[in-house]
Amino acid sequence: MNANLIKIFLIFTIPLFALNISVTILPQKGVIKSIAPDVKVNVMVPPGNSPATYSPDFKQLKAIKNSQVYFSIGVPFDKKYLNKIKEINPNIKIVYFGKYLKTSNNPHIWLSPAFLQLEAKVVLDTLIDINPKDKEIYLQNYKKYINKLANLEVKGFKEIKQKAFITFHPSFYYFAKDFHLKEIALQKQGKAPSFKYLAKVIQIAKKEHIKTVIIAPEFPKKYAKIVAQKIGAKVKVISPLNEEPTKTIEELIKALQ
């Protein structure tokens, strides 16, 4: 087979084996890429946008049409657009991570090392199911990722010295739960806090000697800064929507030392 024929063969065969996966938010991409670096991942809610309010553009909807799998994380975006996604691509396999929310309506499960282990296993099984020829590669990367998460858990329990922290939106609920911490969120049911509630939080924070207020750049900073100033706490800006959730967890551990 001459060189030109080989090129033509590659052009027409490579797309047949290309894996295209769609996810709701950026942290899901980080997990998938840790296990399958060569997979193309379409993120429906781009960085800097809220999963509660974002609407997908034409390019993203087109990517859905070419995707074999959609990983749903359970945020408001999914509830609004999953039916539309099924209409665009009736053959797409949808994996619902939201079903693992057993006792809480808080969807921010991707910052829990315990959940990330579960997510990684579901991703692994799904990838092997649709592309069994790369099973060994996926398994090897999966084991590395699980070890990384296990080391993070050890690091967190060893280095975190604070018992509680304040944030605006309850993005870090499952992180706090995993490490036996108390997260005090200023936002209640999606609404800004009243002055009465702010005063209550300030009183609690002083009583419990809370030293850290964590601000997520995707949400208003005003109220968190007011509380931080009143209690003399340090302010840490940490996004819950970074691509690699293990790095976000490392940032949180460092902030709470």
Q: Where are the language model's segments positioned?
A:
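Extracytoplasmic metal-acquisition and chelation regions
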Residues: L19-Q257
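Hydrophobic alpha-helical membrane-insertion segments
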Residues: M1-A3
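Sec-dependent N-terminal signal peptides
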Residues: L5-F17
